């Protein structure tokens, strides 16, 4: 009740924050005259002065006004660009660990230099995170002269970079790179076999460009390092032959069946489910194909893998469409990012879905993979001491930024007021009517000589629009994931008079459409241009620029609404940069996917009530409100999915922290001899307790079993039965002491043979390998647990609580297994005298060979089961590990040494 009145009196929280920061802006401006008077050398010397003042106890906040003034003056001298006052507010927002929402053309890259310079003074490093390698390299090289003028070093990290070059990049004051590369390097560091192999320092401060893309759109995409799993390509091909024989079961709203079939599709949740008839039919077909034994159920425990393949095939055929969710290029399935319209090379779908699509498209089927290490962007970026970001569209997701990352969103006022006119949506009954109206709007704008940008949601729609324009004889350019190599050239001239560009939401980010075209691109196309040529190009551009402004600026036409309001706002934001005129209009039809799935009934009834005829459009605030409500519904659902995935991953994340802390402590330790001694005692106590229960009678002791376990786990044969027969005073406690003494003596002899230093090095390498191998198996087990845990809901149990309880139990088992397997391997190993330096060099070579065969790619975030709000076969970043070509035994076969253990848990650890 009083909220509107209070807001009117005191302003919104955002307005109050801006007012607060304007006071600091005044202080920065007061320094300007003093900075102008400094020579280049004196200005550069300010960096050393600031570092000295920090060392003496001053804080970054105290340095901020003068440091910002130094950065602004350096920007003027080096880049020819002076930070506006609103850009100073943006810099303060980033420094305070918030998200700065700035409109297109407001100079986000320049804003970043203020907070980056200030925080780099601490010497702890600053990471500038971008969405792709091109932007990382472009921004780093663009701003490098400014930072180097101020005495700071700049590094760029990228995939396939030589290790020494990458370490140097991370050691720089400021490091540019992509979110994927920073995340993968974190995982690589936690698989290193020595401190020298690590890349990253402490995760101090990160500035994320296009922060909504990385922290929201990419939040469901795990980063995974993986090893190759068994080959199932033949099974995918067989299943792919069967799927087209299944038909869809369709029911009307009243429950009337209009088409009997085998499966149903839920478009809202993007799920496909077999019905009873479908189960029976697929079981019969699998039996005929020899894939399922006669009379067996597809739901038998040992057939669940086959069921997964069937569902992967169904999803591939019914939910994933070529030129919509993916394209086929050079014999590979390339996924399309629904948010940017760009392809995502290297990113693969999980749970066999990518292989099923490859089978559907008759491509070579790549092997599945097994997870070795993983994290999510949500958990990785929360590791930074301070996090901030910039984007043109964050306010609609402010709640999520605050609730998950603890980041507040600050809307930075524009340097010039917005002059763009955003028209109401026009809604038509059919898609054909909508496209006809779009063509008419294009013709009208082109008569005036206005540049037009037509935004589409998919490649399919962009190509359909292109075909319609060709029939009309209208010249245009198409920008989508198929023609991405022409992006720079197309965008450079998209603002020229009469230019018509059809684009997917590729054109929504990292691009500025300049009215009149881009004169700098024209100059760059010339070989050794003269001053006269440059002046002429500028003069011609100025005329074109003025001509476009007089006709009304860039007109943006959208062929449909996206699920996210942010993407719609990004498309609108291409027009009206820095106070330029412009306009935007969305054209919709009841056949659009968003309208059909989420908003059509209400709007359709409204249109019927108005008695609308074919070709007529409705332009009403009620319709726009209904669409926005539908978008909010989708955004809310997607937020629930991301939040749910985070809640599950938080469980794994706590375990990940423990394992990585243990691993880093091992790497940092010079000698882990005491750790091994402690492990040996704990494993021995546990082994004895299995066969001699505490406080039990001798008649209850399993002596034969204990002797066998000691031979298996400690590689030592001890006559325990004989000892007991010969010594009446040997009871439980003294027996434990005697066994520990015997085992310790045997290991001491091994130390004498191998040499103390060599064995200590070997112990560390073995413990690291055991830890990595068991952690990999644990991740796989956790993955299986997560996929099936939703079924506990049917037993009236809370799936999340059940997952936490079971994962804790699995983690306790993991910690015990690490100790047990390490001691088993060290006990069984046969040592020979070797020069310590040679031993260390050999182990290092083996570790490097292991690392060199790892693959790093993006796959898809695993779902949480179809009953939950999730997307199975979502994307995920994956990397693969080595497979030994000379390995004669299978990893799950009994070890050759006779221990009775699987090869992977015995001598497979050493080899």
From Swiss-Prot:
GO annotation terms (biological process): intracellular protein transmembrane transport; protein import; protein targeting; protein transport by the Sec complex
Family membership: Belongs to the SecA family.
KW Translocase (keyword) present: yes
InterPro entries per UniProt: Helicase_ATP-bd, Helicase_C-like, P-loop_NTPase, SEC_C_motif, SecA, SecA_DEAD, SecA_motor_DEAD, SecA_preprotein_X-link_dom
Keyword field: ATP-binding, Cell inner membrane, Cell membrane, Cytoplasm, Membrane, Metal-binding, Nucleotide-binding, Protein transport, Translocase, Translocation, Transport, Zinc
Annotated residues for binding of ATP: 87, 105-109, 512
Species in which this protein is naturally found: Pseudomonas putida (strain ATCC 47054 / DSM 6125 / CFBP 8728 / NCIMB 11950 / KT2440)
Complexes and interactors: Monomer and homodimer. Part of the essential Sec protein translocation apparatus which comprises SecA, SecYEG and auxiliary proteins SecDF-YajC and YidC.
Protein name (database record): Protein translocase subunit SecA
Annotated segments matching region Disordered: 861-880
Binding site for Zn(2+): 895, 897, 906-907
Cofactor: Zn(2+)
SMART domains in alphabetical order: SecA_DEAD, SecA_PP_bind
Known catalytic reactions: ATP + H2O + cellular proteinSide 1 = ADP + phosphate + cellular proteinSide 2
Function: Part of the Sec protein translocase complex. Interacts with the SecYEG preprotein conducting channel. Has a central role in coupling the hydrolysis of ATP to the transfer of proteins into and across the cell membrane, serving both as a receptor for the preprotein-SecB complex and as an ATP-driven molecular motor driving the stepwise translocation of polypeptide chains across the membrane.
Taxonomy, superkingdom: Bacteria
Localization per Swiss-Prot or TrEMBL: Cell inner membrane; Cytoplasm
MF annotations from Gene Ontology: ATP binding; metal ion binding; protein-exporting ATPase activity
GO CC aspect terms: cell envelope Sec protein transport complex; cytosol; plasma membrane
């Amino acid at each position: 009740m009083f909220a509107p009145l209070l807001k009117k009196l005191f302003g919104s929280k955002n307005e109050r924050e801006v007012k607060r920061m304007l006071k600091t802006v005044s202080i920065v401006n007061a320094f300007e005259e003093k900075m102008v008077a400094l020579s280049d050398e004196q200005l550069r010397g300010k960096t050393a002065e600031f570092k000295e003042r920090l060392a003496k106890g001053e804080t970054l906040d105290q340095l901020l006004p003068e440091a910002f003034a130094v950065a602004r003056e350096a920007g003027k001298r080096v880049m020819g660009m002076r930070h506006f006052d609103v850009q100073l507010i943006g810099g303060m927002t980033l420094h305070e660990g918030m998200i700065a929402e700035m409109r297109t053309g407001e100079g986000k890259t320049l804003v970043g230099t203020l907070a980056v310079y200030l925080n780099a003074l601490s010497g702890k490093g600053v990471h500038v995170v971008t969405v792709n390698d091109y932007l990382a390299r472009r921004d780093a090289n663009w701003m490098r002269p400014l930072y180097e003028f101020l005495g700071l070093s700049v590094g760029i990290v990228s995939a396939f970079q030589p290790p020494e070059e990458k370490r140097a990049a991370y050691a720089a004051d400021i490091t540019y790179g992509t979110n994927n590369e920073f995340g993968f390097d974190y995982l690589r560091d936690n698989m290193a076999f020595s401190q020298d192999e690590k890349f990253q320092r402490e995760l101090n401060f990160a500035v994320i460009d296009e922060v909504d893309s990385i922290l929201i759109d990419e939040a469901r995409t795990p980063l995974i390092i993986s090893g190759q799993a068994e080959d199932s390509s033949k099974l995918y091909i067989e299943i792919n032959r069967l799927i087209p024989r299944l038909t869809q079961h369709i029911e009307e709203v009243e429950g009337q069946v209009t088409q009997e079939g085998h499966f149903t599709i839920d478009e809202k949740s993007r799920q496909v489910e077999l019905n009873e008839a479908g189960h029976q039919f697929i079981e019969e077909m699998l039996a005929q194909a020899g894939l399922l034994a006669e009379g067996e159920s597809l739901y038998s425990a040992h057939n669940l893998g086959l069921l997964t393949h069937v569902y992967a095939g169904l999803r591939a055929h019914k939910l994933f469409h070529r030129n919509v969710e993916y394209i086929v290029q050079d014999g590979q399935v390339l996924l399309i990012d629904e948010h940017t319209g760009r392809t995502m090379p290297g990113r693969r779908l999980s749970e066999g879905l990518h292989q099923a699509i490859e089978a559907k498209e008759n491509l070579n089927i790549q092997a599945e993979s097994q997870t070795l290490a993983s994290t999510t962007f949500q958990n990785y970026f929360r590791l930074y001491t301070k996090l901030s970001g910039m984007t043109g569209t964050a306010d609609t997701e402010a709640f999520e930024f605050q609730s998950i990352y603890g980041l507040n969103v600050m809307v930075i006022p524009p340097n010039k007021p917005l002059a763009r006119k955003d028209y109401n949506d026009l809604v038509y009954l059919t898609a054909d009517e909508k496209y006809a109206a779009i063509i008419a709007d294009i013709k009208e704008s082109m008569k005036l000589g206005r540049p037009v940008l037509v935004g589409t949601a998919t490649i399919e729609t962009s190509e359909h629009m292109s075909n319609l324009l060709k029939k009309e004889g209208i010249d245009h350019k198409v920008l989508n994931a198929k023609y991405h190599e022409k992006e720079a050239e197309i965008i450079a001239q998209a603002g020229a008079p009469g230019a018509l560009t059809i684009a997917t939401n590729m054109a929504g980010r990292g691009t500025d459409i300049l009215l009149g075209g881009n004169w700098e691109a024209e100059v760059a196309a010339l070989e050794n241009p003269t001053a006269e040529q440059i002046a002429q190009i500028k003069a011609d551009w100025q005329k074109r620029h003025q001509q476009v402004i007089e006709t009304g600026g860039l007109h943006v036409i959208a062929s449909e609404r996206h699920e996210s309001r942010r993407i719609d706002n990004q498309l609108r934001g291409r027009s009206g940069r820095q106070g330029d005129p412009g306009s935007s209009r969305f054209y919709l039809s009841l056949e659009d996917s968003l309208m059909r799935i989420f908003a059509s009934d209400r709007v359709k009834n409204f249109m019927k009530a108005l008695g609308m005829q074919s070709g007529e459009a409705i332009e009403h605030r009620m319709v726009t409100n209904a669409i926005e409500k539908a978008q909010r519904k989708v955004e809310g659902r997607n937020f629930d999915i991301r939040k749910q995935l985070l809640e599950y991953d938080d469980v794994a994340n706590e375990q990940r922290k423990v394992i990585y802390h243990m691993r880093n402590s091992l790497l940092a330790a010079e000698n882990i001899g005491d750790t091994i001694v402690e492990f040996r005692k704990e494993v021995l106590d546990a082994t004895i307790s299995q066969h001699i229960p505490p406080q039990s009678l001798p008649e209850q002791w399993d002596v034969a079993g204990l002797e066998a376990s000691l031979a298996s786990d400690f590689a030592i044969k001890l006559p325990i039965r004989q000892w007991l027969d010969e010594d009446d005073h040997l009871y439980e406690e003294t027996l434990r002491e005697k066994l520990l003494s015997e085992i310790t003596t045997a290991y001491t002899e091994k130390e004498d043979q191998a040499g103390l230093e060599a064995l200590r090095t070997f112990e560390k390498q073995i413990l690291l390998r055991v830890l990595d191998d068991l952690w990999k198996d644990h991740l796989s087990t956790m993955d299986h647990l997560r996929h099936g845990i939703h079924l506990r809901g049917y037993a009236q149990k809370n799936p999340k609580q059940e997952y936490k309880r079971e994962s804790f139990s699995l983690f306790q088992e993991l910690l015990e297994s690490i100790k047990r397997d390490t001691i088993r391997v060290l006990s069984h190993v046969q040592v020979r005298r070797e020069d310590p330096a040679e031993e260390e060099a050999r182990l290092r070579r083996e570790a490097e060979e292991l690392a060199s065969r790892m693959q790093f790619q993006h796959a898809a975030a695993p779902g949480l089961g179809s009953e939950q709000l999730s997307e199975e076969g979502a994307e995920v970043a994956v990397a693969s590990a080595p497979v030994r070509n000379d390995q004669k035994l299978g990893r799950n076969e009994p070890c050759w040494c006779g221990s009775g253990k699987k090869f992977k848990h015995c001598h497979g650890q050493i080899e």
